[in-house]
Amino acid sequence: MIKVVAVVGPTAVGKTALAIKLAQAFNGEIISGDSMQVYRHLDIGTAKATAAEQAQAPHHLIDIQDVDQQFTVAQFVAAAQPLIQAIHERGHLPIVAGGTGFYLQALFDGLKLGADAPGDPQIREHLRQIAVEQGPQVLWQQLAAQDPVAASKIPPTNIRRTVRALEVIQVTGQLFSHQQNAGSQYDEYYIGLNTARPLLYERINQRVDNMVQAGLLDEVRWLAKRGGATLPAASGIGYRELLPVLDQPEKLAAAIDQIKQDSRHYAKRQLTWFRHQTTANWYDLVQHPEVDAQILQDVTAWLTEKN
């Protein structure tokens, strides 16, 4: 199995800096595991590694999509797997850094497209509305057209299962009937970064203020001119809150506060997910920056272990 390091944790805890340090120490290359950093031109709101940071180590899966393009978990896995193989064949260490938990789970554990698949409340509600307004048969016929195998196993009257199957197809870009969990082809080592919650929230609030000062509003205006809220990239935190109030300066302060709140909530969800779904080794580099030496020792020990 190929050894892969994964640097995970909530926003604003130092994942980018640690990934670069690991890449420099172990001849590594960094693969972004973030669903928003794939978008070109959206640098500030996605907390993308700066040009100076990217120059310190090879980076992959950053700036590969236009803002009007979807980027599904299936696309991520399809892009990341050959990258990991190529990095390994170069004799380098693949390092996946990012906060989109389901992407990493799909990569390391195999794509699960059933109950464990991600959901989208807006898509779900839209599909339910179709069932109410046009009848369950119309919804089931949509599924039959897109995934006949799944439709053959779901009665046309079962609205809940029909909605779930269509939701998974739209969110993941994969057929619902292609449920799989082939098991990992990788030996992954999860490094989890976190810090005390009050300090984490303080850092998140400061990061949002820094983003605004760095030109986040200009980035959102650029996005608005290209389709705004209709674009797949517009769903990200920082963009979705500001797009509706660009022409309402009196509401900007409240929107920025909302970004902070949404970011804090997202960080909490990230932590919950990684604690329950991974066997991460947790460290606090915010309060104890000297721990980076221990991380390097731990990775060294893991690298010397046989698969």
Swiss-Prot record:
GO MF, any single term: tRNA dimethylallyltransferase activity
Keywords: ATP-binding, Magnesium, Nucleotide-binding, Transferase, tRNA processing
Cofactor(s) listed: Mg(2+)
Site residues by UniProt (Interaction with substrate tRNA): T100, R124
Chain positions recorded as substrate binding sites: T11, A12, V13, G14, K15, T16
Chain residues that bind ATP: G9, P10, T11, A12, V13, G14, K15, T16
Signal peptide start-end: none
Record field: catalytic activity: adenosine(37) in tRNA + dimethylallyl diphosphate = N(6)-dimethylallyladenosine(37) in tRNA + diphosphate
An annotated GO BP: tRNA modification
Region (Interaction with substrate tRNA): 34-37
UniProt EC number: 2.5.1.75
Keyword Magnesium part of the UniProt annotation: yes
Protein's job: Catalyzes the transfer of a dimethylallyl group onto the adenine at position 37 in tRNAs that read codons beginning with uridine, leading to the formation of N6-(dimethylallyl)adenosine (i(6)A).
UniProt record similarity statement: Belongs to the IPP transferase family.
Complexes and interactors: Monomer.
Record protein name field: tRNA dimethylallyltransferase
